[in-house]
Amino acid sequence: MSMVVYNNQGGEEGNPFAGALTEFSQWLWSRPLGNPGAEDVEEEAIAAQEELEFPEDEAQARHSCLQRTTSWATPKEVSPSGRVYQTVRLSRMEYSRPTMSIRSQASYFSSSARPLPPPPAPSLMSWTPIAKYHPSSPTSTSSKLRRAAPKLIKRG
């Protein structure tokens, strides 16, 4: 069983779920994984962070990811592999420039009888906006067009 809990793009302002998501993520990350009475417990934790800068746009992008996997021995009747694996991950991304800021946060939890392949990590290059901001030039209008008065059409 695996599920993505929430993905919030667009920041926390005006989002009624933002506070609940933060609380849930903190709760999920602080929970002890695994079976408290189990023997032969193995745990692995990974923390990663990357940053990109776009000087031409005065923009920055950041991604941080925390992941913890716990496994423990279990009877073959419970799990054919003889182990149970639980993984929890918290991923946060942010893109900001002088005119905008985008934040995204996702929590992930899985529990399985065999180690699951890690889902693809989000890439900052695919996540950051690809369209660059180009201020539009003012449209030019002819002076004759600006002075023209509307014409009335009579129907009779």
Curated annotation (Swiss-Prot):
Region (Disordered): 106-156
A Gene Ontology term for the protein's cellular component: host cell mitochondrial outer membrane
Region: RNA-binding, residue numbers: 57-156
Superkingdom as given in the UniProt entry: Viruses
Location of the region described as Homodimerization in the Swiss-Prot/TrEMBL record: 38-54
InterPro entries referenced in this protein's UniProt entry, alphabetically: Luteo_VPG
Localization terms from the record: Host cell junction, Host plasmodesma; Host chloroplast envelope; Host Golgi apparatus; Host mitochondrion outer membrane
Modified residues (Phosphoserine): 71, 79, 137, 140
Main location per the UniProt record: host cell
Record field: compositional bias (Basic residues): 144-156
Entry comment on modification after translation: Expressed as a nonphosphorylated 20kDa form and a phosphorylated 22kDa form. Phosphorylated by a host PKC-related kinase. Serine phosphorylation is required for plamodesma targeting.
Domain comment as written in the entry: The N-terminus is involved in homodimerization. The C-terminus binds ssRNA. The C-terminus is phosphorylated.
Function summary: Together with movement protein P3a, facilitates long-distance movement of virions in host. Transports viral genome to neighboring plant cells directly through plasmosdesmata, without any budding. The movement protein allows efficient cell to cell propagation, by bypassing the host cell wall barrier. Binds ssRNA.
Subunit structure: Homodimer.
Protein family according to the UniProt entry: Belongs to the polerovirus movement protein family.
Identification of the protein by name: Movement protein P17
